[in-house]
């Protein structure tokens, strides 16, 4: 399969690009230049690998979920344990790389957006490590849902700005973070948390997250002597999925499944299933599939999981959907909760609500596969942050 994206202008087919005001164009170009240089620089790669190993705790295990496998009665189920990274999710793979870039570019300050708070915590963590000033924008609804992560960020020395505009969720936090970056561009680096935003952000985040798929490939081959037949990951903006899928894109014998949040159901207004129900538009500097109405107004996204309720999806996922290399599905709040409880009870692993969407889809897929086939789930994060809201949810039900 001939797959080489993005092109030199940052496009993935028709998607991606750089839809930014003049005031940001210079910074985006400066970042692209610095990133290209860093990728060619052996010392940078060495330093990045050093921190990934000794600070983040990579490589993460590929765990054979024997009890889940028996329960499903089909394919062998493996979990890529991104929940075991420092800070409890895949997010730090990207923030550590981008913080090293910021230092390399001589920036003193970092700004970021966060939904569930995981990216905020991972950003505040690396800022503490490298002595960078840190400002995090978070929607006020998410601040309410994720009080613990807000406190964590403040403990780490970050300033958390609550955003009341719009729906008070991730989209609004991104708006404010971009605004802040425009006015502080000389000394500030924006650490985008997903494969979103203007080029080169989707590429940078994908490349830093690709460590997930590279390790998985190597580990699975060592265990089974072949590649897995299927790989499943959840999708909000899409960074854990892109990191898992990208190293497998050319291996056409490996089926790739992306799982979005169907919320209360894709037939309702309360979902975040952008690739299932969305249409093409531009948001936050990039062309991609979006949840929007006929006038092009962005619609609210809903999910029980704070990390999946973004009304867009990365440009590369948009392309992978169109060319049919990845098949995208959606899982409801209810199904994700059931999967959350099942994995916890069967394996003693409490997954993040985001990752539970991938687990839920894998539970449907595994029984349709043969016993000698393998299915890998990207367990993108741990569920400690969700236990309180799940307790509330179960009490209400």
Curated annotation (Swiss-Prot):
InterPro entries in UniProt: Trp_synth_b_CS, Trp_synth_beta, Trp_synth_beta/beta-like, TrpB-like_PALP, TrpB-like_PALP_sf
Pathway(s): Amino-acid biosynthesis; L-tryptophan biosynthesis; L-tryptophan from chorismate: step 5/5
An example Gene Ontology CC term for this record: cytoplasm
One Pfam assignment: PALP
Keyword vocabulary terms for this entry: Amino-acid biosynthesis, Aromatic amino acid biosynthesis, Lyase, Pyridoxal phosphate, Tryptophan biosynthesis
Cofactor dependency: pyridoxal 5'-phosphate
Residue list for modification N6-(pyridoxal phosphate)lysine: 91
Catalysed reactions, semicolon-separated: (1S,2R)-1-C-(indol-3-yl)glycerol 3-phosphate + L-serine = D-glyceraldehyde 3-phosphate + L-tryptophan + H2O
UniProt protein name: Tryptophan synthase beta chain
Taxonomic path: Bacteria, Bacillati, Bacillota, Bacilli, Bacillales
């Amino acid at each position: 399969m001939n797959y080489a994206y993005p092109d030199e202008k940052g496009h993935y087919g028709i998607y991606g690009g750089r839809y930014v005001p003049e005031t940001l164009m210079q910074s985006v170009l400066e970042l692209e230049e610095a990133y290209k240089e860093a990728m060619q620089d052996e010392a940078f790669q060495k330093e990045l690998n050093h921190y990934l190993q000794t600070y983040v705790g990579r490589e993460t295990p590929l765990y054979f979920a024997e009890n889940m496998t028996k329960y499903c009665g089909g394919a062998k189920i493996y979990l890529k344990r991104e929940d075991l990274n420092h800070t409890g999710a895949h997010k730090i793979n990207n923030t550590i790389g981008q913080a090293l870039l910021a230092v390399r570019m001589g920036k003193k300050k970092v700004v970021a957006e966060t939904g569930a708070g995981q990216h905020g915590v991972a950003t505040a963590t690396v800022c503490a490590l490298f002595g960078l000033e840190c400002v995090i924008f978070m929607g006020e609804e998410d601040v309410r849902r994720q009080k613990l992560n807000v406190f964590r960020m403040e403990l780490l020395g970050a300033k958390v700005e609550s955003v009341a505009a719009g729906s008070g969720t991730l989209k609004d936090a991104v708006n404010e973070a971009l605004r802040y970056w425009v006015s502080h561009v000389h000394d500030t680096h924006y650490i985008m948390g997903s494969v979103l935003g203007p080029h080169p952000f989707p590429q940078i985040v994908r490349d830093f997250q690709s460590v997930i798929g590279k390790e998985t490939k190597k580990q699975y081959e060592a265990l089974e002597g072949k590649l897995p037949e299927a790989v499943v990951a959840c999708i909000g903006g899409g960074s854990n999925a892109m990191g898992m899928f990208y190293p497998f894109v050319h291996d056409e014998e490996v089926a790739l499944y992306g799982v979005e949040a169907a919320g209360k159901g894709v037939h309702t207004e309360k979902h975040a299933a952008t690739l299932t129900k969305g249409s093409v538009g531009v948001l936050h500097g990039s062309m991609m599939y979006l949840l929007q109405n006929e006038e092009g107004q962005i619609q609210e996204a809903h999910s029980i999981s704070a990390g999946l309720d973004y009304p867009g999806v990365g440009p590369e996922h948009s392309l992978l959907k169109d060319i049919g290399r990845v098949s995208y599905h959606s899982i409801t709040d209810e199904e994700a909760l059931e999967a959350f409880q099942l994995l916890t009870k069967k394996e003693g692993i409490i997954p993040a609500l985001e990752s539970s969407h991938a687990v839920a889809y894998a539970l449907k897929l595994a029984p349709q596969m043969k016993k000698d086939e393998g299915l890998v789930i990207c367990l993108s994060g741990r569920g400690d942050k969700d236990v309180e809201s799940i307790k509330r949810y179960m009490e209400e039900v």
